[in-house]
């Protein structure tokens, strides 16, 4: 993909983006009805946790649960803001595959980190998928100008991605953001990068 391949979207809310927004909203509503059941069964639990061992489906389902209203609002805003143009470039099917691979990849990285750190707390949130989308956005539209919420300074999309990646790495290593799965965010970006490279190599053959 490159910036010249970009087509102005016919809709501000493409099919997969719409479906993901609805799915996340419905799951969040279910959490309000029975949070304990949802978290025990569908959050991503480290294998070291004594009461809720890892189940394979959690690598996907954790990405549809959120800790609170602020958590889901920011993730869904990022999904819509950066994902809508990508879906129009990639096509709905490939975009969905990419997003889900980033979610699962972020979960795998988080499990590895939790195993080394002895973590026992669950992980929830679409952030791994959103960070993967952010990476793809920066690589697809590198020269597009974006304005972060903080700091509100206009910058190139690729610069924004680079700064965010470094910030996540710093926070993950330093422990400066307790309760935030920084390495899961990086995992989403890593798996997204690998998948994009794989697809690009496939087109060259």
Residue ranges and their predicted role:
Residues 1-205:
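A detector for small-residue-rich transmembrane helices and their helix-helix packing motifs
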């Amino acid at each position: 993909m490159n910036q010249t391949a970009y087509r102005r979207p016919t809709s501000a809310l493409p099919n997969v983006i719409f479906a993901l927004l609805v799915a996340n909203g419905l799951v969040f509503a279910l959490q309000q009805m029975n949070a304990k059941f949802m978290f025990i069964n569908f959050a991503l639990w480290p294998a070291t946790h004594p009461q809720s061992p890892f189940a394979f489906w959690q690598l996907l389902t954790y990405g549809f649960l959120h800790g609170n209203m602020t958590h889901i609002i920011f993730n869904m805003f990022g999904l819509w803001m950066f994902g809508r143009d990508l879906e129009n470039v990639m096509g709905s099917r490939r975009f969905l595959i990419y997003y889900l691979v980033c979610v699962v990849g972020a979960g795998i990285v988080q499990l590895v980190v939790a195993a080394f750190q002895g973590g026992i707390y669950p992980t929830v949130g679409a952030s791994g998928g959103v960070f993967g989308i952010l990476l793809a956005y920066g690589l697809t539209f590198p020269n597009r100008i974006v304005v972060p919420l903080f700091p509100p300074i206009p910058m190139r999309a690729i610069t924004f991605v680079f700064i965010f990646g470094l910030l996540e790495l710093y926070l993950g290593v330093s422990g400066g953001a307790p309760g935030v799965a920084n390495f899961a965010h990086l995992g989403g970006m890593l798996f997204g990068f690998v998948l994009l490279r794989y697809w690009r190599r496939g087109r060259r053959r």
